[in-house]
From Swiss-Prot:
Sites of Threonine amide modification: T26
Descriptive protein name: Galanin peptides
PANTHER family: GALANIN, GALANIN PEPTIDES
Gene this chain is encoded by: GAL
Location in or out of the cell: Secreted
Length: 54
C-alpha cells in the first residue's frame, strides 16, 4: 500500500476508498464458492434423513 500511495501521490487517500470497494466486490465473488460448501453441509443432514427413513 505504501508503494501504491507513493505512485498515486496525496490523492491515494481518496483512492483508498475506491480500493476498499473493489475488495468488497471480490468478497461477493467469493460467496458462491461458500454456497458450494453449504451444499456439502446439507449433504450431511440428508444422510441423517436417509438413516431416519431406513
Amino acid at each position: 500500500l505504501n508503494s501504491a500511495g507513493y505512485l498515486l501521490g496525496p490523492h491515494a487517500i481518496d483512492n483508498h476508498r475506491s480500493f476498499h470497494e473493489k475488495p468488497g466486490l471480490t468478497g461477493k465473488r467469493e460467496l458462491p464458492p461458500e454456497d458450494e460448501g453449504r451444499s456439502g453441509g446439507f449433504a450431511g443432514p440428508l444422510s441423517l434423513s436417509e438413516n431416519a427413513a431406513v
